[in-house]
Curated annotation (Swiss-Prot):
Pfam families: Aa_trans (PF01490). GO terms for molecular function: symporter activity. Belongs to the amino acid/polyamine transporter 2 family. Amino acid/auxin permease (AAAP) (TC 2.A.18.1) subfamily. Carrier protein involved in proton-driven auxin influx. Mediates the formation of auxin gradient from developing leaves (site of auxin biosynthesis) to tips by contributing to the loading of auxin in vascular tissues and facilitating acropetal (base to tip) auxin transport within inner tissues of the root apex, and basipetal (tip to base) auxin transport within outer tissues of the root apex. May be involved in lateral roots and nodules formation. Its main location: membrane. It is found in: Cell membrane. Shoots and roots of nodulating plants, at low levels. GO terms for biological process: amino acid transport; auxin-activated signaling pathway. InterPro entries: AA_transpt_TM. This is Auxin transporter-like protein 5. GO terms for cellular component: plasma membrane.
Amino acid sequence: MEMANDKVAETVIVGNYVEMESEGKPPQDIKSKLSNFLWHGGSAYDAWFSCASNQVAQVLLTLPYSFSQLGMLSGILFQLFYGILGSWTAYLISILYVEYRTRKEREKVNFRSHVIQWFEVLDGLLGKHWRNVGLGFNCTFLLFGSVIQLIACASNIYYINDNLDKRTWTYIFGACCATTVFIPSFHNYRIWSFLGLVMTTYTAWYLTIAAVLHGQVEGVKHSGPNKIILYFTGATNILYTFGGHAVTVEIMHAMWKPQKFKAIYLLATLYVLTLTIPSATAVYWAFGDMLLNHSNAFALLPKSPFRDMAVILMLIHQFITFGFACTPLYFVWEKTVGMHECKSLCKRALVRLPVVIPIWFLAIIFPFFGPINSTVGSLLVSFTVYIIPALAHIFTFKSSSARQNAVEQPPKFVGRWVGTFVINVFIVVWVLIVGFGFGGWASMVNFVHQIDTFGLFTKCYQCPPPTPSVPTMPPHQMNATAPSPHHHHH
């Protein structure tokens, strides 16, 4: 690294952030110290917690299902591969953010009560068509991200208390999640993201240890990968796992020194890999092909206090992740209605309510936990998180003057601008073909199959069939996530 250049860049950037830092130090009495510690987070650690905890939530439970579709080796390789791709695009987003912010602050724009979002970065650097595309994909993705959290809540609690069916649980959790309208911004998620990380860590190790202690099921088969359709569905679910950074810009904005963000995302991803690889491998090793019909890993493990604990922790975590996915939507909505700069919390909370209602509704229509992850992954994450940032980076720095005046030069080990350009083009092509093309096709076929099998407003997705005294559908149709041999779709 050329130290001199870095030093200059750093002073330029730090110069702009001085005012933000001085804001971040209110007078310290005990009460404000405590509220600061629990509530107002903007340090590098907070960003790390937010990234890591935001990345893993319910995906831990669907990864073994992906492994059963992909086979062991592909599963591990895809995780590493998409982990690296994800960190790279997060790095691009952070560069574009710092670039946008520095340009704006040279024009003396003040961002005190305004949260910068991804679409504004696109707007400022590339104009309004980019903004509209970015906004469209991002909002749809976050909308469905929130929907998935709701479905996951219902899907999980069912394993503790099955007196109510999953749809009723979705109603209940929808009402609970609506309370996130009262959390003003990402600064206020400090204690939550820390707890979230503790919870996912516990769950991941619970899955690993429980699966190993349980040992392999009799006659366990590991036949994956056998169907091309399932292979790509699984791969896309992994793409979705490491595409958790549609919220990257908002998390960065909540930091006091956003330029530290680049390394943080990579570290978060590395930590996440230590959770996802052991747990998915262990569960797949123990249960093999049984996972093809159980997209939620909790379904196969024996009931125990530890499992109940893991389920409860995941529930609390989903609540937090719901807040994470929804907060940017609230911001966009506030800006549309013109209430974003408003000081009164209650007014803003009221304005935000219409955002929660469609999410609630969608979660009741499509309760397919597992297949919906892959569908969202292929159709939305592929663009929001991989293709758009890579293209935006190419177009922002395509003129040589823009490259010379860039606040931050690309690192030497990737080969400066040429290397960066090559990597970006590779990402765009790869994700378009494998993620969006094959992945989209496979996920949509799988998704439509779920609708054909279960119907839209299905009451209880993948629940064990009721007692045999009532004539029911044959069991293989009740819980088919993979097309069963009786009815092939070609």
